[in-house]
């Protein structure tokens, strides 16, 4: 049986590390307030000349090195991002150019905000299982600092920039076991960026608009359900999960999912305190951190899950 297995991971964080105390000098907030409600202590912010594609390309280089593959071994590139370099072309094609990949492989973006990496990974899995690709580069990359209102203390404290990447390779050994994606556009008012470009003009606010309590309530409910669904549909039990690698948005949401599954927080890869919410980048960033720290080991079962504006959400059960 053909599987898609992670053969390499990599990540990149901008050099500028911003603490809660740093933000408290700019808006009416405090380290205690932010930490108690979110678990976030730090976030990284891209330099003025750093684009989403720059972060993505560096994470990709590290993933390729980890997989011990050459650039032209890659035959599919998918970038999950809600903050592309430009309206078009896709950030994936820009990354393709920056990496020097010249084999003409397909490259495209996926936009499902914080669930984007789940959507991208599931798409790459389908390519590999169908025989359409052998080595896929799957990247989550964001520069959310560009769409945050730095005068709004309810949102500016939450987000950070970064990129994470995996190389997904064809294998006869188990890799991605099961995945499930969901969406419901009826909740778009809870979390969105209302601004839009039309006829050369920008209309509406270009910054994140969020109903925090509404997002929290929906996320807790849907993440618990999709985690149950993926585990059950795969014929597994929660006890067989070695690590949860969740979207790193809010520690309380993460704790709720772990509690629902009956799993200790000792089985959760947690990076929200260091990265903040990096949207589509958060899961691959956490995955790479867990692997490089020695927490995650080959052969272990991982549950990846996340939810983003739309709403769009998803979960992937895989063997590393």
UniProtKB/Swiss-Prot annotation:
List of catalytic residues: 114, 247, 277
UniProt-annotated stretches for the region ACP-binding: 248-252
Pathway(s) per entry: Lipid metabolism; fatty acid biosynthesis
Cellular component terms per the entry's GO annotation: cytoplasm
Keywords: Acyltransferase, Cytoplasm, Fatty acid biosynthesis, Fatty acid metabolism, Lipid biosynthesis, Lipid metabolism, Multifunctional enzyme, Transferase
GO molecular function: 3-oxoacyl-[acyl-carrier-protein] synthase activity; beta-ketoacyl-acyl-carrier-protein synthase III activity
Coiled-coil parts of chain: none
Pfam families, per the entry: ACP_syn_III, ACP_syn_III_C
Keyword Acyltransferase attached: yes
HAMAP family linked to this entry: FabH
Protein name: Beta-ketoacyl-[acyl-carrier-protein] synthase III
């Amino acid at each position: 049986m053909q599987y898609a297995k992670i053969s390499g991971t990599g990540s990149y964080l901008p050099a500028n590390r911003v603490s809660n105390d740093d933000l408290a000098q700019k808006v009416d907030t405090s380290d205690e307030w932010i930490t108690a409600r979110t678990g976030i202590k730090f976030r990284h912010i891209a330099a003025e000349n750093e684009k989403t594609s720059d972060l993505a390309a560096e994470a990709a280089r590290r993933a390729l090195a980890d997989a011990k593959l050459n650039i032209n071994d890659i035959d599919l590139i998918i970038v999950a991002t809600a903050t592309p370099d430009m309206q078009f072309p896709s950030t994936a094609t820009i990354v393709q150019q920056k990496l020097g990949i010249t084999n003409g492989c397909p490259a495209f973006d996926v936009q499902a905000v914080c669930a984007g990496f789940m959507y991208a990974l599931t798409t790459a899995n389908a390519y590999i299982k169908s025989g359409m690709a052998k080595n896929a580069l799957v990247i989550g990359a964001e520069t959310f600092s560009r769409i945050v209102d730095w005068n709004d203390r309810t949102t500016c404290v939450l987000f950070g920039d970064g990129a994470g990447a995996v190389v997904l390779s064809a294998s006869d050994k188990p890799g991605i076991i099961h995945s499930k994606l969901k969406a419901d556009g009826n909740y778009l008012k809870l979390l969105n960026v209302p601004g839009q470009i039309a006829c050369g003009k920008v209309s509406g606010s270009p910054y994140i608009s969020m109903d925090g309590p509404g997002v929290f309530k929906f996320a807790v409910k849907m993440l618990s359900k999709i985690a149950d669904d993926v585990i059950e549909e795969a014929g597994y039990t929660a006890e067989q999960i070695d690590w949860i690698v969740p979207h790193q948005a809010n520690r309380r949401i993460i704790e709720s999912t772990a509690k629902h599954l009956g799993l200790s927080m000792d089985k959760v890869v947690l990076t929200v305190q260091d990265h903040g919410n990096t949207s589509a980048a958060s899961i691959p960033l956490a995955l790479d951190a867990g692997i490089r720290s020695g927490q995650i080991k080959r052969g272990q079962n991982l549950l990846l899950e996340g939810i983003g504006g739309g709403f769009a959400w998803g979960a992937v059960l895989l063997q590393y």
